[in-house]
Amino acid sequence: MNKQPVVMVVDDDPDILDAVTTILSTQPYAIVTARDGLECVDKVRAQIPDVMVLDLLMPKMDGFAVVRELRQNPKYASVPILILTSVREDASRRRYELETGLAMDVQDYVEKPVSPQDILERVRNLLESGRRETDSREAP
């Protein structure tokens, strides 16, 4: 029997964390949550997720630093990451974040608000692409 895919959701906004968790709980996923980047990295060390949904702007350790930390370690470097973020500041700040987010080594990027169907589809696509990558590495 296949194990449930582990999806880690990282956001400092408890309402967003609860909303994304509720959306993902409609699927057969094991969901792990973290409220900041430090907690995220600690939890990844304990259990490597199959996909991560990551906010960028958080206290203690932001999403940019989380991505850098994970990508530096071969054990965690292949975890697919969906950046889920919003910027309430001016357009120049928003543009900076979008360009920086897209330049990072992540698989997908979406701005809040996002529809439940969009989150589910993006996570499903990342899980499928992650499985294909794992299968190709394990093939003789």
Could you tell me what each predicted segment is?
Residues Q47-V53:
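Active-site beta3 strand of CheY-like receiver
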Residues D55, T85:
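Active-site residues of response regulator receiver
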Residues M1-V6, Q117-P140:
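Non-catalytic signal-transmission and effector/linker regions of two-component phosphorelay proteins
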Residues P14-V32:
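Two-component/phosphorelay signaling modules centered on CheY-like receiver
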Residues A65, R88-V110, Q117, E121:
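Alpha4 helix (beta4-alpha4-beta5 surface) of REC/receiver domains from two-component response regulators
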Residues R35-E39, D62-R68:
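Acidic catalytic/metal-coordinating carboxylates
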Residues M58:
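Receiver (REC) domain active-site loop signature in two-component systems and cognate sites
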Residues P28-R35, K43, V110:
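Short hydrophobic/Thr-rich beta-strand motif most characteristic of the beta2 strand and flanking loop
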